[in-house]
């Protein structure tokens, strides 16, 4: 099967992770643009270079696209770039000319512009550092009250006008994609929404798109992986098992639906089918939270897993979402008392609940339907998740105040030995901070 993939940007979870997952099946021929063509925290993607890459692809079975990358230069540039609606429209019309020539199924997604409830502008326009929370409040109250919030008198007019204009531009571009969908260009088109609250312009826009026939999904970075999973032929039957069944109606951080609905939605988007335990191909254990989702980096604690966990004698995978962005140490310690044999189909505790679930299900589905199963690639995927989600995010990161590869490498050694023992394979890796910040680390195999 030949699949081409245009990521959101060049972060490890967006670029390296899908490549690693695809390698689990030697029967997948995976086409990925050069990393240098993609954007990062400061630079937008080389859009013309990506257009040329798309033109040069051989005949494919499936094409997975981040439309933000091809329209704006990436997810972050979609919120920052100053180009007008007409400029973006002209660009995506050229993209459409390329796509109509592709005789394959196209799986695409575009983001609904987020509204972060903070004054942190690393991924936003400069003015977010001073006015971000006020803009969030303005959006929230205007939607909730059904009329313009009085906060409009606090935010400088030129800033509010720019923000509203950027939102309107992106929304109108999304409406164009929806027309393409109705014309039959896409097999699947998803409008993603992340950093959601109960009210806000992003929530309104999602409802408008749904009313027009669009499909919206909570999440962002994992959606290309869910679409990759959807492109894999076959329907896998999955039974979710919540380790805290009385709390599955609670809502995860950065999301707007319960963890139970999030799990169901991720299974369906990935081309899976919800099943009961007796009929399931794979069991999905969800280490969910009891009262609220913790957040290790933010110092928000929550009740850790306190029971026993014995792996089943059948295929299973584990979404560890008790904390946002990092493992539940108690649960991992309990998990590691087991033998992770051929029935183990994956573990993830990557960032948000949606991130964890989407990436986990994708890896499991590729393994389940693999025509040429590559065990080494699967083990590399699990090494990456345990070292990133457990060793780094839940432990070593807390000892660092700034990116320091030497300190990171030294701190990871004891965890590497544990992972070697549990996965019964050598761990020979090196680390880097590709975006020069603590938030993400790259695990590279030597």
Placement of each model-derived feature along the sequence:
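An N-terminal assembly and electron-transfer interface module characteristic of large anaerobic redox
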Residues: 1-446
